[in-house]
């Protein structure tokens, strides 16, 4: 199995320990099963979106402190559903590499899957806070009346939006980009999925009215996705521009330079792994089980925000140093 399993991975270097030793082997057997039934990777991604979004219903109802065993089971079901959604989200890529069924739409769906999960989940957590907030009000010394409940819920909703847009969306977008960048220097252009907004805009411009509306909408959103990745990494963009200027094509980048980039990138990738699903969701599960779901928003904004800044700072620093040497 090892050889066949390894072929379905992008690279062991970009997987954290839990993914490499637990999640990915499990996903491999799912991929084998789906391949036997000729199920397309994009179908698996869509299943992942539906399952992850469905977890929101149970997160919104789950509360051990307020609802006893029933609420605890709602939390557990929500956690299991979100974990299953992540397993399917990992399986789609392994299935695509196993069967060769890769597509531009698949790459775009992969990029938005997490947002489809967490958008309803975050709203469900705000609704849960609206129903159950005695602990937080007691801590803050707030009188538990209807007016204060609505005010606090609006604050929680605002925190949820900040957490989702400035937190989850921005953090996972950057984490995904750094994984693809590392793969680019490790395996070359064919071994990675580093996209740039200019090429994606050209792809969109070539679409006609006969192109399915869904595909055009996803492609348009993917242009914005890649632009935000580029805007967050100016030193890396400068490095790539200097490499193209010096070598004419990224295919001509010397192996010695690729090895040096990989050496500098590898320690950052280890930290970058904390921005992906496993570490992030562990905190979500913890705060929900503690019946303090809104505190997760604060953690994602502050704690995960500082971690994202650190990863971005380290990556941009060594990119600037490499660019200055060219």
Which residue ranges define each predicted feature?
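Select subsegments of transmembrane alpha-helices in polytopic membrane proteins
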Residues: 41-49, 110-118, 269-278
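Transmembrane alpha-helical segments that form the membrane-embedded catalytic/substrate-channel core
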Residues: 83-90, 165-182, 305-317
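Structural signal for membrane-spanning alpha-helices in multi-pass inner-membrane proteins
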Residues: 56-63, 121-128, 288, 311, ...
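Alpha-helical transmembrane segments
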Residues: 126, 131, 143-182
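Hydrophobic, membrane-inserted alpha-helices
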Residues: 30, 51-56, 120-124, 279-287
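C-terminal membrane-associated helical module and adjoining short loops/tails
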Residues: 1-26, 180-326
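Membrane-embedded alpha-helical segments that form the functional core of polytopic membrane enzymes
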Residues: 41-105, 118-122, 153, 157-166
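Cytosolic-side membrane-entry/anchor segment at the start of a transmembrane helix
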Residues: 2-25, 29-37, 86-133, 168-171
């Amino acid at each position: 199995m090892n050889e066949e399993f390894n072929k379905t991975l992008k690279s062991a270097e970009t997987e954290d320990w839990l993914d490499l030793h637990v999640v990915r082997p499990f996903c491999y057997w799912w991929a084998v099963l789906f391949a036997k039934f000729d199920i397309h990777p994009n179908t698996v991604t869509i299943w992942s979106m539906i399952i992850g979004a469905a977890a929101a219903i149970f997160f919104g109802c789950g509360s051990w402190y307020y609802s006893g065993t029933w609420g605890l089971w709602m939390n557990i079901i929500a956690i299991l559903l979100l974990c299953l959604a992540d397993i399917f989200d990992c399986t789609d890529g392994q299935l695509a590499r196993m069967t060769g069924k890769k597509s531009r739409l698949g790459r775009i769906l992969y990029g938005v899957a997490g947002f489809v999960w967490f958008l309803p989940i975050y709203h469900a957590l705000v609704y849960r806070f609206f129903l159950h907030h005695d602990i937080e009000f007691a801590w803050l010394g707030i009188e538990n009346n209807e007016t204060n409940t609505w005010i606090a819920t609006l604050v929680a909703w605002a925190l949820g939006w900040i957490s989702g847009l400035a937190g989850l969306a921005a953090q996972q977008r950057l984490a995904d980009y750094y994984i693809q960048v590392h793969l680019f220097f490790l395996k070359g252009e064919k071994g990675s999925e580093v996209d740039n907004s200019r090429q994606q805009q050209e792809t969109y411009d070539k679409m006609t009215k006969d192109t399915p509306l869904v595909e055009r909408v996803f492609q348009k959103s993917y242009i914005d996705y890649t632009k935000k990745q580029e805007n967050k990494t100016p030193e890396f963009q400068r490095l790539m521009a200097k490499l193209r200027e010096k070598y004419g094509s990224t295919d001509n980048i010397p192996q010695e330079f690729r090895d040096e980039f990989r050496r500098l990138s590898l320690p950052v990738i280890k930290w970058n792994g904390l921005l992906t699903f496993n570490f992030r969701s562990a905190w979500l599960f913890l705060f929900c089980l503690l019946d303090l779901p809104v505190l997760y928003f604060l953690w994602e904004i502050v704690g995960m925000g500082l971690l994202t800044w650190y990863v971005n700072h380290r990556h941009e620093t060594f990119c600037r140093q490499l660019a200055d040497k060219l």
